[in-house]
Amino acid sequence: MPNISLSSRCNLHCPYCFAHETMGAGSGDITLENFDAALEFLTRTGPVNIGLIGGEPTLHPHFDEIVRRAVACENVAMLTVYTNGLLIEKHADVLSLPKVTLLVNWNAPNELRGGAFEQIKRGVDELVFNRDMGRRINLGLNLHGESMEYGYMLDLLKRYGFDKVRISLTVPEFPEGCGQNAIERFRACKPFLLKMFADMDAIGVLPYYDCNRPPWCIWSDEEKQWLRDLAARHGADECTLVDTESFCRPVIDVLPDLRAVRCFGMSAFEKVDIRDYANVNELVAHFMRRIDRPAYRIKAMPECENCHLRRTWLCCQGCMGYKMVEIEKMNAERGE
């Protein structure tokens, strides 16, 4: 799903954020003219789901107008607002419009200050209990180490009666984090993930992965069967927890100045002007050639050498940002 970044500003400083490269830089807030141009570009080939991101998108001074414009666009099938939740009560009227869904990345109480946790709760309460938006809100949990406190999230999921939660295994800022090995990190997180999944299953919640999904090969046969059984209990035999394929394709994030990146994880690699491309498909093809093609040729571990999934672009072995330096070298060798 392509995204439009409304602002490079944010009212939090999350330890796991990989968007610092664009935060507080560039042109700040997107102009309404540029928003209209970005929306037209992304929907030029037909109906599509669009995300509003940041920074924190709700900080934009014309956020309500932007949401209304996007909802009114007949080629916007669904509009997802990615938010930390601090200002959703203020914008409840537009956030409850048709087509709008929310992904609330809700940090732990010890990571929030000055009543921020309760402020987020008031906003979600308003949308769920007074605006009947329970089926249009997802909560997000961001794992930025090998473990974390997640009891608060279990309480929130029970409070709102939610039956799913997004799990994001965050990545370091690139290119500084390129020396790390994604597979080793996934393996280190396994005990924690299995315990957390079991605790979520116990309250009727099915977790699902964001990008940077662990490859299926990190699990033992016993663990694979346990995950299959968990998914089956929720009637979700094809959910991300048991998907044998672990890959991503260019997302396309349009920045306030109308430059685009493949995704925030690769934002330091290359930014291109959307006005130089006929449509979003042409832009995707550009990033596939410049980033994805070399990325799938790079082996994260020796055992990846003969992996059929890697060879057929169905396992990217974690976020491509880990391979950024190697991708640049391969492109240079090809004269790009």
Question: Where is each model-derived feature located?
Answer:
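Short acidic donor-binding/metal-coordinating loop in glycosyltransferase active sites
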Residues: 6, 54-55
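Short, solvent-exposed loop/turn segments at secondary-structure junctions
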Residues: 11, 57, 87, 109, ...
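Radical SAM/AdoMet-radical enzyme domain recognition
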Residues: 32-53, 60-186
